[in-house]
Amino acid sequence: MSTMKFCRECNNILYPKEDKEQKILLYACRNCDHQEVADNSCVYRNEVHHSVSERTQILTDVASDPTLPRTKAVRCSKCQHREAVFFQATARGEEGMTLFFVCCNPNCGHRWRE
C-alpha cells in the first residue's frame, strides 16, 4: 500500500471515494475527475506501538481495578504485602497463558508471574 496516489492526468492527489452502486473503492482526482479502482481496500493503517513505560503503567493501574480477582494467598517479594490482583495473559514470545500478579500496595505495584 503506497502512502499517496497521484492522478495520471494532472499529477494532483487522488482521494479515496466510494462507488455506492458497485460497492467498490475508487481513487478520484478533485481537479480533473479522473478515477481509478483501488487495488487494496485499506485506505489508512494506524499502528500503535507502546513503549515499555506505557505497558508498565497499564500493569500498575490494574491493582486498583475492582473487577479483577484478588488473592491474599501470595506475598509480594518486594514489600511483603499479602494482597495482589491476578489475571491471565499471553507473555511476549510465549505460547499459552501466563498467570500475572500485581501487588495491591499503592506504594509498590510490583508485578510477577507464575
UniProtKB/Swiss-Prot annotation:
<keyword id="KW-0479">Metal-binding</keyword>
<feature type="binding site">
    <location>
        <position position="7"/>
    </location>
    <ligand>
        <name>Zn(2+) 1</name>
    </ligand>
</feature>
<feature type="binding site">
    <location>
        <position position="103"/>
    </location>
    <ligand>
        <name>Zn(2+) 2</name>
    </ligand>
</feature>
<dbReference type="Pfam" id="PF02150">
    <property type="entry name" value="Zn_ribbon_RPB9"/>
</dbReference>
<dbReference type="GO" id="GO:0003899">
    <property type="term" value="F:DNA-directed RNA polymerase activity"/>
</dbReference>
<feature type="binding site">
    <location>
        <position position="76"/>
    </location>
    <ligand>
        <name>Zn(2+) 2</name>
    </ligand>
</feature>
<dbReference type="InterPro" id="IPR019761">
    <property type="entry name" value="DNA-dir_RNA_pol-M_15_CS"/>
</dbReference>
<feature type="binding site">
    <location>
        <position position="79"/>
    </location>
    <ligand>
        <name>Zn(2+) 2</name>
    </ligand>
</feature>
<dbReference type="InterPro" id="IPR012164">
    <property type="entry name" value="Rpa12/Rpb9/Rpc10/TFS"/>
</dbReference>
<dbReference type="InterPro" id="IPR001529">
    <property type="entry name" value="Zn_ribbon_RPB9"/>
</dbReference>
<feature type="binding site">
    <location>
        <position position="10"/>
    </location>
    <ligand>
        <name>Zn(2+) 1</name>
    </ligand>
</feature>
<dbReference type="GO" id="GO:0008270">
    <property type="term" value="F:zinc ion binding"/>
</dbReference>
<dbReference type="InterPro" id="IPR001222">
    <property type="entry name" value="Znf_TFIIS"/>
</dbReference>
<keyword id="KW-0862">Zinc</keyword>
<feature type="binding site">
    <location>
        <position position="32"/>
    </location>
    <ligand>
        <name>Zn(2+) 1</name>
    </ligand>
</feature>
<dbReference type="GO" id="GO:0005730">
    <property type="term" value="C:nucleolus"/>
</dbReference>
<dbReference type="InterPro" id="IPR034012">
    <property type="entry name" value="Zn_ribbon_RPB9_C"/>
</dbReference>
<feature type="zinc finger region" description="TFIIS-type">
    <location>
        <begin position="72"/>
        <end position="113"/>
    </location>
</feature>
<dbReference type="GO" id="GO:0000419">
    <property type="term" value="C:RNA polymerase V complex"/>
</dbReference>
<comment type="subunit">
    <text>Component of the RNA polymerase II, IV and V complexes. Interacts with NRPD1.</text>
</comment>
<dbReference type="GO" id="GO:0005665">
    <property type="term" value="C:RNA polymerase II, core complex"/>
</dbReference>
<dbReference type="GO" id="GO:0003676">
    <property type="term" value="F:nucleic acid binding"/>
</dbReference>
<keyword id="KW-0804">Transcription</keyword>
<comment type="function">
    <text>DNA-dependent RNA polymerase catalyzes the transcription of DNA into RNA using the four ribonucleoside triphosphates as substrates. Component of RNA polymerase II which synthesizes mRNA precursors and many functional non-coding RNAs. Pol II is the central component of the basal RNA polymerase II transcription machinery. It is composed of mobile elements that move relative to each other.</text>
</comment>
<feature type="binding site">
    <location>
        <position position="29"/>
    </location>
    <ligand>
        <name>Zn(2+) 1</name>
    </ligand>
</feature>
<protein>
    <recommendedName>
        <fullName>DNA-directed RNA polymerases II, IV and V subunit 9A</fullName>
    </recommendedName>
</protein>
<keyword id="KW-0539">Nucleus</keyword>
<dbReference type="Pfam" id="PF01096">
    <property type="entry name" value="Zn_ribbon_TFIIS"/>
</dbReference>
<dbReference type="GO" id="GO:0006351">
    <property type="term" value="P:DNA-templated transcription"/>
</dbReference>
<keyword id="KW-0240">DNA-directed RNA polymerase</keyword>
<feature type="binding site">
    <location>
        <position position="108"/>
    </location>
    <ligand>
        <name>Zn(2+) 2</name>
    </ligand>
</feature>
<comment type="similarity">
    <text>Belongs to the archaeal RpoM/eukaryotic RPA12/RPB9/RPC11 RNA polymerase family.</text>
</comment>
<keyword id="KW-0863">Zinc-finger</keyword>
